[in-house]
Regions:
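The feature captures the catalytic groove of carbohydrate-active enzymes
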Residues: 110-147, 180-256, 272-300, 341-358
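Solvent-exposed loop and edge beta-strand segments that line ligand/cofactor-binding
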Residues: 4-24, 56-83, 130-143, 213-230, ...
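Aromatic-rich carbohydrate-recognition surfaces in CAZymes
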Residues: 67-195, 224-228, 232, 354-364, ...
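Generic long, charged, amphipathic alpha-helical segments
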Residues: 332-349, 451-462
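Catalytic cores of carbohydrate-active enzymes
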Residues: 8, 12-34, 40-49, 66-70, ...
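Non-catalytic C-terminal accessory modules of carbohydrate-active enzymes
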Residues: 362-540
Length: 540
């Protein structure tokens, strides 16, 4: 058997500091290595960033926990904070329960004199005079309905509460039915979700004053790929929810609708290398560059599984190619090329070309999971250096790498980076509830770490996944302690190595060899697990 050489956590190994005083790096998720505490400290900074954005809202006799009081930001942050947060449900449930009769969800809660409610028509806000608060939907937004479904998935995986799901599911389905049928939201001719002409998923319209967030007769309308990949993901999530409740017929209906939407996306939005920024419907746009404009949702599209491996790799290759030619310090564009001017933003300002850590996080995860593992790790290490320099991660960066903190929540990018480490680098994916089924696809061989311990789970349900890893000349070993009854393993083999034998709990096991790009993986299933931990040894 390949033996582990050190116990973790520890403060010093072989005369080198490899841990922190008082183990500040320990939480969900966290990593301890025998080499240095850099990755663990990076995760700690990201968690602290998200903790710092946590607030409470008191409305209609309820106490809501929000990580920003916009459900969009909150859901994007849920992909990380689900691991430690005890109050994941209050804000999400409030948004679900206040759903408009036609299926539209509201999105944000603001003080009465923060006049977001004046930016829209009366049917897009609700007043709470006793609390001096308003509940608002910026009408031009086309991402809320699918994000509520995404948030429901994060919540349900931490609870497995079928009674909650039975109550919530009709609302979730009604929301997706609304966004795919309402004449303001749906382009019937092309079978795709539409929105006013904005920069990717943002909330201001080209050629309109910033105080107008409505959809009107003269609003320039376009189709943006990210809205549609989000709805595609939501449809597949609704299928999964229905299957959990033994509604097989409904599950297949949602899967069929998802496939039709995907077909339309590729028919109208795919340029052979990536998804174009916007397909304009009733106007000619700002210039003639939309077909070559790479917007941030391309990285999200991959992680929503609307692209297959080959298509995903083409998108990643476009980012790699632009890294070589850009004058920016990094290729994690909000949009590239930027517009000459969009609203009052000039190139490099805000989402008109600033560099985005949420793009970095999503792109790193996509690369790690699609055969560009070294590139994914490179993105993480570059973000680690920025966080070491600044002490945190910012919402956006200027093209010269100086922070551009105004305009949005830095927690959004922090969450995307945590997810890249957790579901990409560590490759621990909950495909059931409370990690009772795991897709295990670790990529640690692309790092310089030779021995480590990685810990993740859900604090609220006391679900713990604890992985030990070591690599030596003769092979590598993973010990996985988890609640999983079944593990689908997808194990990366280091470059220039081959597997001579696979052992699971000291018993030889068959495997399939799977090539992803130039990377080689061993695929096998471990079922009806009754031994803890599961020990996986790959002998070279």
């Amino acid at each position: 058997m390949i033996d582990f050489e050190h116990k973790l956590p520890s403060l010093n190994i072989d005369g080198k500091r490899n841990g922190t005083y008082n183990n500040t790096e320990l939480a969900f998720p966290s990593v301890l290595t025998t080499t240095d505490p850099k990755l663990g400290c990076f995760l700690h900074k990201l968690r602290s960033n998200i903790y710092g954005e946590r607030t409470l809202v008191f409305i209609d006799g309820k106490i809501l926990m929000c990580d920003k009081n916009w459900i969009r930001d909150h859901v994007h942050v849920m992909k990380a904070m689900r691991h430690w947060e005890y109050n994941l449900d209050s804000f999400l449930n409030f948004i679900i329960e206040t759903q408009r009769e036609d299926g539209q969800f509201y999105e944000l809660i603001k003080q009465y004199d923060d006049y977001h409610w004046k930016l829209v028509n009366e049917d897009c806000y609700v007043m709470y005079p006793e609390d001096n608060l308003t509940l608002v939907r910026l009408e031009l937004e086309a991402d809320i309905e699918y994000l509520v479904v995404e948030g429901a998935m994060y919540l349900y995986r931490t609870t497995g509460d079928d009674e909650w799901l039975k109550k919530a599911l009709p609302h979730l389905e009604k929301g997706i039915d609304y966004i795919t049928s309402d004449e303001k939201r749906w382009d019937k001719e092309r079978g795709l979700v539409k929105r006013p002409f904005t920069i990717d998923t943002w909330d201001f319209t080209y050629g309109k004053h910033g105080s107008n967030r409505k959809i009107e007769d003269d609003t320039p309308m376009s189709i943006m790929h990210g809205d549609n990949s989000g709805v595609y993901q939501a449809m597949n999530q609704l299928a999964w929810f229905n299957r959990r409740l033994n509604n097989e017929g409904k599950a297949k209906e949602w899967e069929n609708r998802a496939e039709e939407l995907k077909k339309n996306m590729f028919k109208y939005l795919w340029n052979g290398k990536f998804f174009i920024h916007q397909l304009h419907l009733n106007h000619s746009g700002a210039d003639n560059l939309e077909n070559e404009r790479l917007s941030l949702s391309n990285a999200y599209d991959i992680n929503r599984f609307v692209t297959d491996t080959e298509q995903s790799r083409l998108i990643i290759e476009e980012y790699i190619s632009r890294r070589e030619t850009t004058n920016n310090f990094a290729e994690w564009f909000s949009i590239d090329p930027p517009y000459e001017q969009f609203l009052h933003y000039t190139p490099g300002q805000y989402v008109n070309g600033a560099i985005s850590p949420f793009t970095a996080g999503e792109l790193a995860k996509a690369a790690l999971n699609n055969g560009y593992e070294e590139y994914g790790w490179d993105i993480i290490t570059r973000m680690m250096k920025l966080a070491e320099r600044d002490g945190t991660v910012y919402f956006l960066y200027n093209t010269d790498s100086t922070p551009q903190p105004e305009g949005g929540p830095s927690a959004w990018g922090a969450a995307a980076l945590i997810s890249a480490v957790d579901e990409g680098l560590a490759g621990i994916n909950d495909i059931g509830v409370n990690y009772d089924e795991i897709f295990f696809a670790p990529k640690f061989p692309v790092t310089y770490y030779t021995e480590l311990r990685y810990i993740t789970g859900y604090e609220v349900s006391k679900s713990l996944v604890d992985v030990r890893y070591i690599i030596k000349e003769e092979g590598m070993r993973y010990d996985v302690y988890s609640p999983a009854k079944n593990i689908k393993a997808h194990i990366l083999i280091p470059k220039s190595k081959n597997c001579s034998k696979l052992l699971v709990n000291s018993r030889e096991m068959n495997f399939a060899v799977n090539k992803v790009g130039a990377s080689i993986y061993l695929d096998f299933d471990i079922n009806t697990i009754d031994e803890k931990p599961v020990s996986i040894e790959v002998l070279f």
